[in-house]
Amino acid sequence: QFPTDYDEGQDDRPKLGLGAR
């Protein structure tokens, strides 16, 4: 589980645990 900041700018990508908000 990475920090949401990582997926914050990548909301376009599928949230496979990459900081799913």
Swiss-Prot record:
One of its GO terms (cellular component) is extracellular region. The keyword Glycoprotein applies. Conversion of fibrinogen to fibrin is triggered by thrombin, which cleaves fibrinopeptides A and B from alpha and beta chains, and thus exposes the N-terminal polymerization sites responsible for the formation of the soft clot. Residues 1-21 are annotated as: Disordered. Its main location: secreted. Residues 1-10 have a biased composition (Acidic residues). Keywords: Adaptive immunity, Blood coagulation, Coiled coil, Disulfide bond, Glycoprotein, Hemostasis, Immunity, Innate immunity, Pyrrolidone carboxylic acid, Secreted, Sulfation. It is found in: Secreted. Transmembrane segments: none annotated. The modification Pyrrolidone carboxylic acid is found at Q1. The keyword Zinc does not apply. Cleaved by the protease thrombin to yield monomers which, together with fibrinogen alpha (FGA) and fibrinogen gamma (FGG), polymerize to form an insoluble fibrin matrix. Fibrin has a major function in hemostasis as one of the primary components of blood clots. In addition, functions during the early stages of wound repair to stabilize the lesion and guide cell migration during re-epithelialization. Was originally thought to be essential for platelet aggregation, based on in vitro studies using anticoagulated blood. This is Fibrinogen beta chain.
